[in-house]
Amino acid sequence: MNRAGLVSITFRNKTPREIVALMKRAGLSQVEWGGDVHVKPGAESAAEVRRMTEGEGLRTSAYGSYYRLEENAFGPWLDEAEALGAPVIRVWAGRKGSAEVDEWERETLVHTLNDCVRQAAERNIVVSLEYHPNTLTDSRDSVRRLMRESETSFHWQPRWDWPEEERLAALKEVVPRLTCVHTF
């Protein structure tokens, strides 16, 4: 089922309570809470945000962690996703574009990705890579390769620098593993 929701970072300057109020007014049913502003790891706010969200009849669709595959310790990010009741955790596929990484770097990132997918699956959480420039998801070729190398899912968003036909083709390719479409 498709449901309209909100990514909390759209309103970085608002509190979670203000975001929930805006969502209720707009008739939205779900939210992806951002880990860089609204639910930071270790801040012990995830459980509180979950209670508030669910108390208003809304659901958390994902935790936008901003975890990047080069970082260590994925566990604290998973702890936050679990405390939020998020079925999906959004992560970034590195800090460099696919053309900038050598084979060793790519293999290391994919190994880390697969480890993250395994850890998350143990908690019934799905790892979803954000489709984003300057990461391993910056090209259709690289994404197709990731689909062969890993069981990851994808948070797709349109590339503003691609023609419409290219965007639609890229979206169709990830549909079998699509967890979310970001539109803006």
Where would I find each of the regions flagged by the language model?
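N-terminal pre-domain/capping segments
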Residues: 1-88, 114, 121, 153, ...
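Active-site-proximal loop/turn and secondary-structure-junction residues that shape catalytic pockets
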Residues: 10-12, 35-37, 66-69, 93-97, ...
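Generic recognition of short, well-ordered alpha-helical segments
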Residues: 17-18, 44, 72-76, 104, ...
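Acidic/histidine-rich catalytic cores of soluble enzymes
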Residues: 24, 30-31, 114-184
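Active-site-adjacent beta->alpha loops and helix N-cap segments on the catalytic face
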Residues: 39-50, 99-110, 138
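Surface-exposed, active-site-proximal loop segments in enzymatic domains
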Residues: 66-78, 94-107
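Active-site groove signature of glycoside hydrolases
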Residues: 81-102, 123-133
